[in-house]
């Protein structure tokens, strides 16, 4: 087989079409037999509440009696759990099946401490498709006040256990340092992974929402709660599949209305009144921090106020066991301030909910990146040395709200939002391209890149040098509103969903730069190109409107299908004008005008670079037809869940594009197939076994700008072109996992496999001019890109006393990256294929000794990289670390948290990056006033060896970047806790 045309595509487009045809036939068969599934059973549903408080009375006994002889026909318990975690549906809702026979009946409801209620129940004139009848709410009256004793269940401090479908983590079982926030706890949870962006995974599954006491606080911003909620307030962390408001409203699970959530449960004493903490401190190197976090809880409302300001970059605490590496640091030096408010109000009647938040954030970031890049080219590579110095200033305000109303036969969900951002960024950039590897030069020789005349040694292999200073400022805003309503039908289990949203965005951007390119030939400076430029990117605005209707047809209780139609219209209007100020006298190479200043409009308006200025207008119309087939089956020993979710989208997109050389209007019509969440899952009822297989298809149409056949020379070293023949790309994801849990032993393990190929991937292939270092990019469709993963992970305790526990993961990654790279003057570009194989391992052991703990940790990634070119030299690379962590209780009520880790790198092209860095952090703390005040001293990178190096690789080359990091420091800070209970 010719390796230049090799591709592994498990699902072709013809096969995908066959799948859709088979699915349609299946739906027809199901619909044809649907009526036979309506057996002679009528489901009665309702809810039981206290007459005075309107609070549910779960556990009430509900019976249906024959009105003629009072014989009991059916009975049930009004206790609903929805199969989604044991505590989120502790309600008195009930469902009960009776023979489908018209007549007069009596409903009897009883519960200890309440008077028995009797309700007449005439069941007359049953409709043909009426399979259930809603009896509404029945209120029970108390004959007298009863004092009920609270039941307290004491359990041993196991780290986690399963209760139904819910994983329950006991927060008190983890050894955490004084002053630790929620992020420290989440990092230690068995099976959990916490990314630096706040994204959480449990057993490889993405956590869609982070909840607080079952409420969706800080929606979409996990880091607010992770960075500000103290762990001393946390009782348990629960992970489960949560059903949404629509499922609760309808009394049945709605397709697509389930989210995988992590629910943080507070200790009982913090569930009412005001609770919070205040923290402040300062240290060496002008480090500082200040924090306020306060919450108020009542039985029907929650309010949170928070503020945070610091210049510490990293929220990690010494002695916390995790898989943190220096690359997780926020790049550079960051000074940020953040403040916000979050609220939630639930009506006691359950008829409405109000919630929302507002946040303002300011950040200054200074980052210096030193990058070495190897460019894979036919007949010999080239090598880049890049230094980027950026100072970014941003202010952002965001607010979103939710108004939810519930009526007898419909609900209404309204969500408005508004976001605004201002930015002012300064940048410095230096790029030197060589025909020889940087390994051949000393550091002092390479540093001459920044001088007016580069060193003689570099001149011999220099191709080009780019020096650029830039200033970018502007603002953006986006606002929108969505409305959704679910409508119930009185005599049918079916329901109708209506959805609409509208959004508007507006952006303004001013970009200034002084850009100089020196071209070299035969060891001499051959030519210099200097440009003083002003980009006026405004207006840039657009709007979008969406409407959707979906009808859910309930075939039987365990089988339903949802048919939907969605229409979206999006309009975008962009203007970008480029002015060449260097053509004015005194604005050229030796200009003294400060970057960001402009001459009069009359002076520069005629200097427009027409070839690289443009205005574009685009209108998209998308029609999406979807279906959602759900089947679930409960048995005595196992549960099955399966769903198929095919979508067919018809896109009609029109663009008008005009610049100095092109004035064109064109339309692209595309048919896209998508399958967002198709899966089959099996679980044992004892929760010891779980298997799941998922298949997703994500079809993406090419960006319309890529169809415009223009030659953009805005960046003389990176020229872009269009391609009118691009095809849609399809990413297929096949994911399978098996989980084994040992509840009594506190052990679990998981094995997961992933295979993710991309059909018709859009690659920005390029041809390279070795004489000037100029790249000319053109988008092309390529096949053969895919990646796969196989790993085994486990966590749990290792001894009977539960003092020794572990977390471990071992696996492999394989990635095949395909691109197109050619040389200037060659007719066609060659396929560049790079194969990357990585072996991963993580292991952490923790041993608990009374109120102290000590742990060992090790993480490693070992990779082998090969390519299809004859001149490609395969190489190996490794990143690994190992060390220990400890939380120690000392005399005089002192507590020490510390971690010592060796970070090692091997196989980097830049030999200075192949290093062994010992990083030591420590925290000494002491509580005062019964724990209300905690004083802490932190030492960060005490040995001063921390460095931040990242490496990326694809078919175009290898990039290694060293970023500046915060210098070592000591900081003294104190935290005061408060808890104000209502009288």
Language model features by range: what are they?
Residues 42-50, 137-138, 764:
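A short, amphipathic beta-strand motif
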Residues 49, 63-65, 108-112, 128-172, ...:
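Short, acidic, small-residue-rich periplasmic hinge/interaction motif at the N-terminus
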Residues 53-76, 162:
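Short, ordered, surface-exposed loop/turn motifs in non-cytosolic proteins
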Residues 70-71, 89-97, 104-125:
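A short, solvent-exposed loop/turn motif at the edges and junctions
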Residues 75, 88, 220-223, 243-286, ...:
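Primarily recognizes Gram-negative and organellar outer-membrane beta-barrels
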Residues 79-99, 199, 225:
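Short, surface-exposed beta-strand/beta-hairpin micro-motifs centered on an aromatic residue
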Residues 166-189, 197, 202, 212-217, ...:
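Short, polar/charged loop or turn motifs at beta-strand boundaries
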Residues 199-245, 261-266:
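Periplasmic plug
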